[in-house]
Amino acid sequence: MSKRDAERAKKRIEAAALKIFVHQGYHGTSMRDIAKASGYSIGNIYNHYKTKEKIYVGLIRRFETRMAEKRNEFMENLGDVFDTRELERLAWAVHDIVFSMPDYWRLMYIDVVEFRNRHFAHSFHQFAKKVEAALGERLETSTRRGSWSGVDPALAITTIYLQFFNYFLLQKVFSVKQPLGLPDQQAISQIIQMMTRGLWRDTRLEKT
């Protein structure tokens, strides 16, 4: 079998397995189930994957490649990182990632329940460092346009990034409408305001 044919077979097997995993869980899915759904015999599947877990890991790796491509694409296009308009663009980029790959997040929750997050923990380990590396000098430069508070900029942008993820995950994966009680545009604007300006007005400025 050529490499192209082998890759095509693996994609077909993984696609079939994914549909079953997200409905029945990992341990609730048998190789026989995957064989029936994919149209390949069990023996044929074992030619490509030594175990069922290898199929599961293959799915995760394929999603992670797409995730990294999307994340790097919008990170490269961010200008002044903490500008409110740029943060709004970031929010909608996160929306695109979450809504275009809902099964990735379902696999993550399966992993938490059935594997104690064995296959996903690395994805978020030292995540702020990964974001910092992707943004490079722009991250530090973006703190120089005003009186920066002293918060680690990598920590700040990563916190904002993850807040957007949580917001849209509630909508797509948990089917929660308007989790903050506002339309998306207003909710995003409020999150950005809270993250960049804080909760309190500077009364010292009002008295002068």
Annotate the PLM regions.
Residues 105, 140-192, 202-208:
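Hydrophobic/aromatic-rich alpha-helical bundle segments in the mid-to-C-terminal region
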Residues 14, 60, 64, 109, ...:
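Amphipathic, non-transmembrane alpha-helical scaffold segments
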Residues 12, 16, 20-54, 58-62:
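Helix-turn-helix
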Residues 59-90, 135, 140-143:
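Amphipathic alpha-helical linker/stalk segments
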Residues 72-103, 153-160, 204-205:
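Hydrophobic alpha-helical connector segments
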Residues 99-119, 169-174:
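Amphipathic alpha-helical segments used for helix-helix packing
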Residues 68, 72, 96-100, 118-144, ...:
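Amphipathic alpha-helical packing segments from all-alpha helical-bundle domains
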Residues 1-8, 75, 203-208:
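N-terminal intrinsically disordered/low-complexity leader segments
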